Amino acid sequence: MNDFETRFGGIARLYGRGGLQKLRAAHVCVIGVGGVGAWAAEALARSGVGALTLVDLDEVCVSNINRQLHALTETVGHAKVAAMAERIRAINPGCRVTAEQKFFNERCV
């Protein structure tokens, strides 16, 4: 059993090996990694998703600490996408994370 199978074996028991492989092959974009988006991105990483693109222009500030996963004393002033990307890599080292620090609008699509 390799590290990925050990790390995400619970997902395979829930969705089957085929389901886990679909998650591993998936690429998901999370637009906005604040209060809700950070939780969504972390849940995707913990589910074995193979690639995540994170999009957010904002930086972590002290007032985020009470509700945002990536908001810690040491991440204040850092780009939210960079702080979240680091957290995701610690959870799921095989996940390919692209961090885009920019504002999302119809021109970005």
Language-model features, listed with the residues they occupy:
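Glycine-rich adenosine-cofactor-binding loop
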Residues: 24-45, 51-56
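Residues at or immediately flanking beta-strands
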Residues: 27, 96-98
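Rossmann-fold cofactor-recognition segment
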Residues: 71, 98-99
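N-terminal charged helix/coil linker that caps or initiates catalytic domains
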Residues: 1-29
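Electropositive phosphate-/nucleotide-binding environments in soluble metabolic enzymes
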Residues: 5, 13, 17, 34, ...
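Conserved SAM/SAH-binding loop
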Residues: 100-108
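Glycine-rich phosphate-binding loop and adjoining beta1-alpha1-beta2 segment
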Residues: 49-92
